[in-house]
Amino acid sequence: MLTRIVLFAITNIAVLILASIVMSLLGVNPTQMSGLLVMALILGFGGSLISLLMSKAIAKHTTGAYVIEQPRNPSQRWLLDTVRRQAEIVGIGMPEVAIYEGPEINAFATGADRNNALVAVSTGLLQNMSQDEAEAVLGHEIAHVANGDMVTMALLQGVLNTFVIVLARVVGGFIDSLLSGNRGGGRGVAYYGIVLVLELLFGLFATIITMWFSRRREFRADEGGAYLAGRNKMIAALERLGINHGQSTLPTQVQAFGIYGGIGEGLRKLFLSHPPLSERIAALRMARE
């Protein structure tokens, strides 16, 4: 947790330094930026942190997942025992374990606290995977929790949101001044239109960065699953996903934390939260050699 906080602080300092450089190059008075920076920080981090704090409730509501309080059958008992054992190995609190209705093979983890997380699996996973394969998937999700990926993603999104808000308005003000010849600080309708376009453009690049980081996260979680369940089991689980994949039906709010995130070609690959299954399998096999 301390490492993530330090990284978060360093990244924010870098954003502020970059914003100061841009303002200096564009001739913007830094004293006029204090209000913008405060607004950007509030808006940039407000949404991502609120989403993080509410992530478990949102996930349960959007997927219809029900938490296993008392196991009703051997399958549910096995789920609880496996998650408990893996959580003890990595030194985190026992997550809530839930099942949600879904034909695809998938699972996800979420939560703002690594000691109070949620791990959920689809009914499709329980019906189509062997216990060895399911154990590896659970290990993958437990690795996400142990690595603090949900918190890291929220902090990254907050930093990028702040950057987009500040940069769009600084550059938008500069362009508006060039077009209108108005350097007195007053803003017309054109300024807000320019800012909107720039926010969409910079937001697109921010999404590409976020998804790139998410794909790196998945390789690390696969390694965690291999550690907790065994490398061969993790490879077999990913191969099973390749056979029985189909389009993910997870809601957008939790899709990035599923074991499977869909497929894409060309430029669409830049916006995928998960690497291709073939690359994930190859990475696991390469690490074994």
UniProtKB/Swiss-Prot annotation:
What terms describe the molecular function in GO for this protein?
A: metalloendopeptidase activity; zinc ion binding
Tell me the keywords, alphabetical order: Cell inner membrane, Cell membrane, Hydrolase, Membrane, Metal-binding, Metalloprotease, Protease, Transmembrane, Transmembrane helix, Zinc
Give the enzyme class.
hydrolase
One Pfam assignment: Peptidase_M48
The record's InterPro entries line, in alphabetical order, gives:
HtpX_protease, Pept_M48_protease_HtpX, Peptidase_M48
Q: What is its EC number?
A: 3.4.24.-
Cofactor(s) the protein needs:
Zn(2+)
Biological process (GO) annotations held by this record are: proteolysis
In this chain, Zn(2+) is annotated as bound at H140, H144, E218
CDD domains (alphabetical): M48B_HtpX_like
Regions that span the bilayer: 5-25, 33-53, 155-175, 193-213
Where it sits in the cell: the answer is: Cell inner membrane
Q: How is the cofactor bound?
A: Binds 1 zinc ion per subunit.
Topology of this chain in the membrane: Multi-pass membrane protein
Main subcellular localisation: membrane
Gene Ontology CC entries for this record: plasma membrane
Q: Give the active-site positions.
A: E141
> Which family does the similarity line name?
Belongs to the peptidase M48B family.
This one is known as Protease HtpX
